[in-house]
Amino acid sequence: MGCGIMKYGITEMVKTIDTKTRVVDVTNEIAKKKYQAIRDFLEGEEFKEVVIFGVYLWGNYTAQMLSKYADKVYLVDIHEFMKGFVPNNNSIKFLNLNEFKLKFIRGEVNPDLIVDLTGLGGIEPEFLAKFNPKVFIVEDPKGVFDVDIYEADNTYKRTAPFIEKAKVGVLKTYRKARVSKTSGTMTLTIDTIVDASREITSLDGVLYAIPNLRYYEGILFHENDIHKFLSEISQPAITISTLNDVLDEAEEILSNNINLIYSFVEEL
């Protein structure tokens, strides 16, 4: 969390307030909820070798947390520059997808836990089917029903090869009584901040509330600029123009919206 900053607006009667809660704080809270759902599903099991497919947006957090319960964690991503998110940790090794496939062909990887966070258009079911883990978990990217998203999704094709030979779980994330098109961490971050902004605007004395959001994926995947990405998501989540000091109410509204997010793993 940052510290709420108050400045004057056009006149001294109008104040401009930035929330203490930053964009990254919302993202981190969502990551914690998703990881806790995975941890509950694993029921305290420990693993020799874990493979996590997908660094963005919370694979790195998952790797760090699971490294406490595993001898080795491979964090695999199709984008080489994603290595910049991975801390120096002897138990976590980043591999781009081609490097990982080469290690697999050589028989150098044999995970007993696989976590697939790649979502829509992610890792191919045919490649996943070559493994024999004790546990397989895949993140279901779907949120509220959308015909095109449902047609593009292949979550259950990815789980099919493991149903008879492993413990299989599908990670699902929704917002209670709210609409989000996908369960993606960025989708949920944006929807949470936008909805909170609308609620803050309804407070007495508030002129407007602006979500401080950017096209973050453009910064990351088009510019490949991790430092700029991290700088942008470290900005206050919402800026408020107001006659009154509504910072505490704004923080409570943000917190309530974050608390609407619910993650669980459905066992197949």
Curated annotation (Swiss-Prot):
Domain of life: Archaea
The species this protein was found in: Methanocaldococcus jannaschii (strain ATCC 43067 / DSM 2661 / JAL-1 / JCM 10045 / NBRC 100440)
Pfam family, any one: HcgC
InterPro entries, sorted: HcgC
Protein name (record): Uncharacterized protein MJ0489
